[in-house]
Structure formats: C-alpha cells, structure tokens
C-alpha cells in the first residue's frame, strides 16, 4: 500500500447541518487549492444527513501533516459542530502520531493487499 488512507467521521450536532456544510465546502476548497499530495478527499452524508464520512488518501505522513496545518482554524470550527473520530490506514510517522495525539484516532497498520489501476478512469 502506498501512502496513507483515512476515514474520518462526524456525528453532526442537531441544528448544525448548514454551518457544517459551509465549513465542509471551505475545507474542500482549501485542500483543492493548496494540497497537491492529497490524492482523495471525498465527503459523504448518510440519508438523514446526521453523519458525514470523509474518505481521504495522502501520499505520505508529511502530506497529512500539511493537510492538518492547511485546514488549521477551519478544522477546529468544524470539529465543534459534531463528534469527530478518524481511522488511519497505513504506517504513519511518529511526528504525525504526535500531531493527532489529542484526537479520537485509531491506527491500522498495513498487512498486505491488492492495488490495481482502472483503465480509462480518471476522477
């Protein structure tokens, strides 16, 4: 497995959905404009829009550290609107682990797997 994958989750607080979506759009714009090493950054809502899941892929731990720094204040604001948790898949650096030390983050180390390119597909 190359890089790091994340699944981040928000249980959105009641009455905070529109504010959450506004900040989500801001996060997406910041990542799109400033993070060439963010390979995937996709947001999904459940059917009643009380939960949001973000699927993220970064080239390495430094790219994820840059992501945290880039979102900065916006990250704090959006985390105030919901209960946040995250799962990191891969082998994060010690520096990254220190950066997320106060957050609800679980780490799953890579064992083995399969990765294939999809012919003719682009995002």
Per-segment meaning from a language model:
Residues 1-52, 59-70, 79-123:
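Short S/T/G/P-rich N-terminal loop/turn motif that feeds into the first structured element of a domain
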């Amino acid at each position: 497995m190359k890089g790091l994958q994340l699944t981040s989750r928000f249980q959105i607080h009641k009455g905070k959905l529109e504010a959450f979506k506004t900040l989500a759009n801001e996060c997406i714009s910041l990542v799109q404009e400033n993070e060439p090493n963010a390979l995937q950054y996709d947001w999904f809502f459940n059917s009643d829009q009380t939960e949001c899941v973000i699927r993220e892929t970064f080239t390495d731990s430094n790219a994820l550290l840059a992501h945290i720094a880039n979102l900065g204040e916006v990250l704090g604001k959006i985390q105030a609107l919901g209960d946040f948790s995250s799962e990191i898949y891969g082998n994060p650096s010690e520096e990254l682990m220190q950066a997320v030390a106060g957050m609800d983050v679980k780490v799953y180390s890579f064992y083995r797997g399969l990765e294939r390119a999809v012919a003719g597909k682009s995002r």
